[in-house]
A protein has these predicted regions:
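Class I SAM-dependent methyltransferase SAM-binding "motif I" and its flanking Rossmann-like core
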Residues: 1-60
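A contiguous loop/helix-start segment that scaffolds small-molecule binding in enzyme catalytic cores
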Residues: 59-152
Length: 152
C-alpha cells in the first residue's frame, strides 16, 4: 500500500517464534494437529469477518489460538468469541491463557472453554482453545496428530 508513496522499502526476514508456538511449547503439544490463529482486533478487520472466521474454525474443529484477545477499549470481543466457539464445542474442551510468553514472569492459566474467565486476559495474553480431540495430560495440553478410532 505504501510502495507508490515511499518506494520499495528494504526487507530483512528474521526467523523467529510466534506467540502461538511459544505458548504451545509452554503448554505441551496443543498444536499437534490442525490449528489456526485468529486476531480478535477489529481495528483493521471488520468484526463480522472475525466472527465468520471463528465459526469456520469451530466448524472445522481446529485448535484456535486467539491473538489480541482484549484491550482496555475492546472488551466484548473475547466473550463473544468464547460464546461462538462454545456453541460448537463441549464446555470441558481444554483451554489456556498464556500471558507474557517468553518473558520473565510469564503466566499460564490452564482451564476449560466453559470456565475461561475473560477478566484474566489482557492484550499480552494468547488464548488457546483445544479441538474435540485435545486433552489435558497432567499439566500438558495435547492434541494428538491423528484421529484414532473410538475405543483405541
Amino acid at each position: 500500500e505504501l510502495t507508490p508513496a515511499f518506494g520499495e522499502p528494504p526487507v530483512t526476514v528474521v526467523p523467529g517464534v510466534t506467540a502461538a508456538t511459544a505458548a504451545a511449547a509452554v503448554l505441551g503439544a496443543p498444536l499437534g494437529h490442525d490449528h489456526c490463529s485468529i486476531s480478535l482486533s477489529d481495528l483493521l478487520t471488520p468484526w463480522p469477518v472475525i466472527e465468520a472466521r471463528l465459526r469456520a474454525a469451530a466448524d472445522g474443529d481446529f485448535v484456535v489460538s486467539l491473538y489480541n484477545p482484549r484491550s482496555r477499549t475492546r472488551r466484548h470481543q473475547l466473550p463473544r468469541a468464547l460464546a461462538l466457539l462454545g456453541a460448537r464445542r463441549d464446555p470441558d474442551t481444554p483451554a489456556a491463557v498464556v500471558t507474557d510468553v517468553g518473558r520473565p514472569g510469564a503466566q499460564v492459566i490452564r482451564t476449560t472453554l466453559g470456565r475461561l474467565d475473560p477478566d484474566q486476559v489482557d492484550m499480552l495474553s494468547l488464548v488457546v482453545i483445544g479441538s474435540s480431540i485435545t486433552r489435558w495430560s497432567g499439566p500438558h495440553m495435547v492434541t494428538p496428530r491423528g484421529y484414532l478410532p473410538e475405543g483405541t
